Amino acid sequence: MPWIQLRINTNSDHADAIGDILMEQGAVSITYEDGKDTPIFEPKLGETPLWQDTVVVALFDAGTDLAPTVALLATSPMLGENFPHKIEQIEDKDWVREWMDSFHPIQFGTRLWICPSWREIPHPDAVNVILDPGLAFGTGTHPTTALCLEWLDSLDLSDEEVIDFGCGSGILAIAALKLGAKKVTGVDIDYQAIDASQANAVRNNVQDQLALYLPEDQPEGLIADVLVANILAGPLRELAPLIAEKVRQGGKLALSGLLQEQAEELAEFYSQWFQMDPPAYKDDWSRLTGIRK
């Protein structure tokens, strides 16, 4: 069935309250969009931040008369008369199919491909990781994930032990195993990430080589030849001593999840333990690599 969509321009202070009013008026869904392409980085744990300029998007059944809803909102001091809004008809679609059609196999480096399960593998003889978008972060489409995948592809991981620190979907851990690593340990603070990583490992038939832990459960003295951490600049700095002690002397490190302007300072901080390389950049993001001293 078709739908009617009401879009309202507001700010982060009023967005939730406006959404509540729209739900009371019969909206079947409420979503929030960025009104001015403003990025939000490193929200607090458990926080769902909104942009200062927020668009509240409400979806109604096609037969809904929105005039009373618009009139009600116009009386609110949050919006006022003649508040900016837009009403449009939304055609009915197979939204699941449209979502699936937006994901394609992607190549990283020279050997590695990430392929959704519903797509034909373009190069069966390549190193292929089968991964579908899901709850946990990491499908290869984000620049930080891409930077880490390209780095892993550039390494000879034969018989190496690897730690994926902040494993998310398990994409980096599974890629490392497919690229020849002997064993990979994934650590994440989110139990959903652990579950997602396990499911993806089973799908790629590498579950026997992948050990997954919440931080409080990881083995004492855990150490590896290669460590990759695609998290955020704040945790990367806070956890630097812990990360450093998990890399053997002469071992390799990759850090991502940080903005270009954060790279230089973080590289200087990690130089206490690592011989750091020049940063690599993709879009607004960066990756740091180094060798353990």
Swiss-Prot record:
Q: What is the E.C. number?
A: 2.1.1.-
Q: Does the keyword S-adenosyl-L-methionine apply?
A: yes
Q: What class of enzyme is it?
A: transferase
Could you tell me what reaction this enzyme catalyses?
Answer: L-lysyl-[protein] + 3 S-adenosyl-L-methionine = N(6),N(6),N(6)-trimethyl-L-lysyl-[protein] + 3 S-adenosyl-L-homocysteine + 3 H(+)
Q: Which GO molecular function terms does the record list?
A: protein-lysine N-methyltransferase activity
Query: What does the protein in this record do?
Result: Methylates ribosomal protein L11.
Q: For binding S-adenosyl-L-methionine, which residues are annotated in this chain's numbering? A: T145, G166, D188, N230
What cellular-component terms does GO give this entry? cytosol
Q: Which keywords are on file for this protein?
A: Cytoplasm, Methyltransferase, S-adenosyl-L-methionine, Transferase
The UniProt entry's sequence similarity note says: Belongs to the methyltransferase superfamily. PrmA family.
Q: According to its UniProt record, where is this protein located?
A: Cytoplasm
Q: Which organism is it from?
A: Shewanella denitrificans (strain OS217 / ATCC BAA-1090 / DSM 15013)
Q: Name one Pfam family in it.
A: PrmA
Question: Entry's InterPro entries?
Answer: Ribosomal_L11_MeTrfase_PrmA, Ribosomal_PrmA_MeTrfase, SAM-dependent_MTases_sf
- GO biological process terms held by the UniProt record: methylation
Keyword Transferase annotated: yes
What's the name of the protein?
Ribosomal protein L11 methyltransferase
